[in-house]
Amino acid sequence: MADDWESAADSEVVIRPTGAASVNKWEGEDEDEDIKDSWEDEEEKKDEEKPTKTEAPAKPKPNKALKAKLEQQARLEEEAEAQRVANLSPAEKLAEKLRLQKIQEASDLKHAQEAFGVTSTCGGLDAFNPESKEEFKEFGATLSWKVSQFRESEHFPQFVEDLVRSLCVNLSAADIKKVKMNVEILHSEKLKLEKANAKKPAGKGKGKVTLRTENDDIDGYQKYGNDFTEDYDDFM
């Protein structure tokens, strides 16, 4: 009888599922889905943060037609300039030659100043501040070059005479004597050269004799200078 009661009691026992067991998902399945969603969000953010590549603009190809047109225009301008010069009178041609010479001289002076390291904004002779012997030599070369640009003027000889006198005022008697000796030597050499050039028959195509000085290397840029300018630099 007791066995029957125990069997009945066992058969009436009902195991009720807990709240967690009522969910139709495996343990940890919700966590997996949350992790998956977070991964997807991170991938989307990375895609948004990736910089967009911009293609470099293609280099323009040279326009052959434009290049040919520019060359033709330059050629026509050169021909027109040559025709203009050809139609000038002798006096106008001389004036044009002097104009171009002045332009070239200004360019040469600029190059000479750059070679001497003259970079001051004031420019010109005011930029020099000579202290050493070499610096005074460079300053004298530039000053002589500048002055010699006016050598064709009828007033140039008197100008040089006045300039030498005003410079010698600040010298001692011994220094003035040295200047005087150099001028006398220069005068003697000039007389010899003038006589030699006067004796040569004209029309043989030989150049006249010129006087060379030790400053020729320094004043090599003075391609428009004459003998007097070079000699003047020597005794200055």
Swiss-Prot record:
Residues 47-58, 68-77 have a biased composition (Basic and acidic residues). It holds the Pfam family eIF3_subunit. It is found in: Cytoplasm. InterPro entries: eIF3-like_dom_sf, eIF3j. It comes from Drosophila yakuba (Fruit fly). GO terms for biological process: formation of cytoplasmic translation initiation complex; regulation of translational initiation. It comes from the Eukaryota. Residues 1-84 are annotated as: Disordered. Keywords: Cytoplasm, Initiation factor, Protein biosynthesis. This is Eukaryotic translation initiation factor 3 subunit J. Its main location: cytoplasm. Belongs to the eIF-3 subunit J family. The keyword Cytoplasm applies.
